[in-house]
């Protein structure tokens, strides 16, 4: 057997080996992306400032309309708490809805509190959508996923 006869076999083996390495690297990239995304989410979710804001919404927010909420909280801590918490859940909703993260992984942990927050703010959001139709839409679309897990 001549050396030239082995060339196609060597090339095919090298190509196959390269393809396997690329697949392994892509899996690692996916895993790294997952870790980076979820670590950031949990870091925010577990922070004292976020928890304080979330607890304020769930336990102290009493307004039932967007105009009433704005009248009492615009430019104050209440508005900041509302924007912080709802913005967070809306962004998580975007990740879940675009399937950039697997819902069970996140929602088994944060889903219960997301439901509590959504239940509390839903009347305000409905009212606010008269002016801003897409307001917190990804958060709302995530809520049924939260109930699944």
Functional labels for PLM-detected ranges:
Residues 81-149:
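An amphipathic alpha-helical interaction surface
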Residues 28-66:
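Amphipathic, membrane-active segments
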Residues 1-36:
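Membrane-embedded hydrophobic alpha-helical segments
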Residues 44, 73, 80:
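Surface-exposed, interaction-prone regions with an acidic/low-complexity signature
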Residues 3-6, 75, 79:
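Membrane-interfacial loop-to-transmembrane-helix junctions in polytopic alpha-helical membrane proteins
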Residues 50, 54-75, 123-135:
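Membrane-interacting alpha-helical segments
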Residues 21, 25, 42, 46, ...:
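Hydrophobic/aromatic-lined pockets within catalytic cores
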């Amino acid at each position: 057997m001549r050396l030239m006869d082995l060339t196609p076999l060597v090339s095919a083996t090298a190509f196959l080996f390269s393809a396997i390495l690329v697949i392994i690297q892509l899996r690692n990239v996916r895993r790294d992306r997952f870790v980076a995304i979820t670590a950031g989410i949990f870091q925010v979710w577990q922070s004292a400032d976020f928890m304080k804001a979330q607890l304020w919404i769930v336990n102290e927010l009493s307004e039932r309309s967007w105009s009433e909420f704005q009248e009492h909280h615009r430019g104050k801590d209440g508005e900041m708490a509302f924007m912080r918490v709802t913005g967070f859940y809306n962004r998580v909703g975007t990740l879940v809805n675009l399937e950039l993260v697997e819902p069970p992984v996140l929602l088994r942990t944060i889903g219960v509190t997301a439901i509590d927050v959504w239940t509390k703010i839903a009347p305000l959001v409905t009212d606010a959508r008269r002016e801003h139709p897409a307001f917190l839409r990804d958060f709302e679309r995530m809520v049924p996923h939260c109930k699944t897990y």
